[in-house]
Amino acid sequence: MSRLHAHKRYHGQSGSKRPLRTTKPEWAPYDKEFVENKIIELAKQGYSPAMIGLILRDQYGIPDVRLYIGKSLQDFLEEKGLLPDIPWDLIYLLKRAYRVYKHIELNPRDTQAKRNYQLIISKIHRLAKYYKRKGVLPKDWKYSIEIARLYAVQ
C-alpha cells in the first residue's frame, strides 16, 4: 500500500527474495522452545511482529520463524493472545496520521502536508473497510483524530 498514491507505482520494486528453505538450517543453535519464549518475551515488551522478526534475524541469526515453530509469527502471537485489538499496519497509519496532523496544526500553510494527510486518511479508510469486511474490526469503527492520538501516544 505504500506505492498506492505514487506516480511510478510499478518501478523500482526489485529486492532480495526469501530463501526457499523448508527445513531448519543445520548451523542454527536454537531450538523451538527458545524461539517461542523469545517471541513471547519480545511481544510482551511491545514489539510488533515485524520488529520481532527483525530482532530474531539480526541478533539471533534466525532466518525464518516458521521453520522453527511451524507457523507464522502472526498466527503464533494470535494463538497466545498477544496481538493488539487493531492490526499493526492500521496502528502505524494512525500514528503517521497524527504526526502529520500535529505538523499541520503548527504549519497551517503547508499544503503538501495537507495533501499527504488526505492520502494517509484515504489509506486508513480503505484498510478499515477491508478489516471490517474480514471481521477484524467492529462494524461501527470509525477513524477520528482522537483515536489516532490515543495510538500515537502509546
From Swiss-Prot:
Q: Name one Pfam family in it.
A: Ribosomal_S15
Which gene produces this protein? rps15
Going by the entry's taxonomy, the superkingdom of the source organism is recorded as Archaea
GO CC annotations? cytosolic small ribosomal subunit
In Gene Ontology terms, what is one molecular function of this protein? Answer: small ribosomal subunit rRNA binding
Where does this protein have coiled-coil stretches? none
Q: What's this protein's name?
A: Small ribosomal subunit protein uS15
Family statement drawn from the similarity comment of this UniProt entry: Belongs to the universal ribosomal protein uS15 family.
